[in-house]
Curated annotation (Swiss-Prot):
Glycans are attached at residue 97. It comes from Oxyuranus scutellatus scutellatus. Contains 0.9% fucose, 2.2% mannose, 4.2% N-acetyl-D-glucosamine, 3.5% galactose, and 3.8% N-acetyl-neuraminic acid (sialic acid). This is Acidic phospholipase A2 homolog taipoxin gamma chain. GO terms for cellular component: extracellular region. SMART domains: PA2c. The keyword ATP-binding does not apply. It is found in: Secreted. Expressed by the venom gland. Belongs to the phospholipase A2 family. Group I subfamily. D49 sub-subfamily.
Amino acid sequence: MHPAHLLVLLAVCVSLLGSSEIPQPSLDFEQFSNMIQCTIPCGESCLAYMDYGCYCGPGGSGTPIDDLDRCCKTHDECYAEAGKLSACKSVLSEPNNDTYSYECNEGQLTCNDDNDECKAFICNCDRTAVTCFAGAPYNDLNYNIGMIEHCK
């Protein structure tokens, strides 16, 4: 393929990605990871939640493959709902510029009352997802499964 054609193809792909309705990541991925650590002490293996099943990680499609994947689908849907709140428009457009406030006490997560409407909503999306993760078994066979083949 001619290099100019590759550039056009790349531009189209980037354009399509930019216009798709992929839910934004947590306000602060590190915060979400810390929430996971609070509830499920997993060390470096917490990253395994970022490429699991059809919904854990960027994007998501098809039918969730198990309970843990359903937790991630619900989390994606929660973020989509947050995107509909007028209070969240500026926060979600630049998600790493702000963080929500929460506490971890003996494995229990609480979103603090000092969060504004959007941060409270997103904190609860993340808290609910992490609580769901804690109750769902992790199946090593569903890590990095290849979305194209398995998530239609």
